[in-house]
Regions:
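Core catalytic alpha/beta fold that binds nucleotide/phospho-ligands
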Residues: 1-114
Length: 114
């Protein structure tokens, strides 16, 4: 869970944080518009939950854990490099995610399958 106001404040006071946490693809909606702070906070909640499911891999790059939207709008987790390697060690081969944001809170559930 991520408090949207706290997340927004952290982004505002830390130059470059958005680019460190999110790929260019994640920062835009499927129609190419900038994604809102609540949506970014929810995507960060997914990344944080995935990292915790893997025991917070040493040297994890946030870009190696990307939340993308399918054509249907359904969110999907794509893992590469550092996160993919950590998942392989744990036998994780697939992910299920759910994202929500309401009343100033962004929440995510991540299930690592293998």
């Amino acid at each position: 869970m991520v408090e949207v106001a706290r997340f927004t404040a952290a982004i505002a006071r830390t130059p470059g944080l958005t680019n460190r946490l999110f790929t260019a693809r994640e920062q835009l909606t499927r129609s190419g518009h900038p994604r809102g702070q609540a949506s970014l906070a929810a995507r960060f909640a997914v990344k944080e939950a995935a990292a915790k499911a893997l025991g917070v891999p040493t040297g994890m790059d946030w870009h190696d854990c990307q939340v993308v939207s399918e054509d249907s709008g359904r969110p999907r987790l794509e893992v590469t490099a550092t996160v993919e390697a950590a998942a392989a060690v744990m036998g994780v081969t697939d992910w299920r995610i759910s994202i929500s944001h309401d009343a100033g809170i962004a929440a995510a559930v991540v299930i690592a399958l293998g």
